[in-house]
Regions:
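Short active-site oxyanion
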Residues: 36-39, 66-68, 102-107
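Alpha-helix capping/helix-boundary segments
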Residues: 15-16, 46, 76, 96-97, ...
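Acidic, PIN/NYN-like endoribonuclease modules and their adjacent C-terminal/linker elements
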Residues: 1-4, 98, 102-132
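A short acidic, often aromatic-flanked loop/helix-cap motif at beta-alpha or helix-coil junctions
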Residues: 48-49, 75-80, 132
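Acidic catalytic patch
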Residues: 67-88, 99
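Short beta-strand scaffold positions
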Residues: 71, 92, 109-111
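Short, well-structured N-terminal submotif of metal-dependent ribonuclease cores
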Residues: 1-41, 51-62, 122-132
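Short, structured loop/turn "capping" segments at alpha-beta junctions
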Residues: 40, 90-93
Length: 132
């Protein structure tokens, strides 16, 4: 671990699920980020997957009110697709999280640790991960 300072946070699908189930640590982390001027980022593809798979969409909406939703288009979508092919996964929401974290130099709040670490290693990004 080189101790590289991260510029922000990227939320993955696991962060949305944790927020939807009312996870206190997730909400505390989110409030702390906002109170310190950090606006977490979440890829649009992870937002879509969150609404597809989570019954408590009201809580997802609450969380999203304090985040920046990163569009999943153009160059970012191309890079995510290439990373997904290289790490042999069809989970674009996870790979999009790594793509955003690498490009923006962010730490990650997510759940799928194995895929995240594999994808991060492929792009040469030292992953700082808070697992929810």
């Amino acid at each position: 671990m080189t101790g590289t300072r991260r510029e922000g946070l990227v939320y993955g699908l696991g962060a949305l699920h944790a927020a939807a189930r009312g996870d206190r640590m997730m909400w505390a982390l989110h409030r702390a980020a906002l109170s310190n001027g950090i606006v977490p980022v979440i890829p649009a593809v992870a937002v879509a997957e969150g609404y597809r798979t989570e019954a408590r969409s009201d809580r997802i909406g609450e969380l999203l009110a304090g985040t920046e939703v990163e569009p999943f288009a153009g160059e970012a979508a191309r890079r995510a697709g290439e990373i997904a092919a290289r790490c042999d996964t069809s989970d674009l929401s996870v790979v999009a999280v790594v793509e955003v974290a690498e490009r923006r130099n962010c730490a990650v709040v997510a759940q799928r640790q194995t895929v995240l670490r594999t994808a991060a290693a492929l792009v040469g990004h030292e992953l700082v991960l808070y697992a929810v």
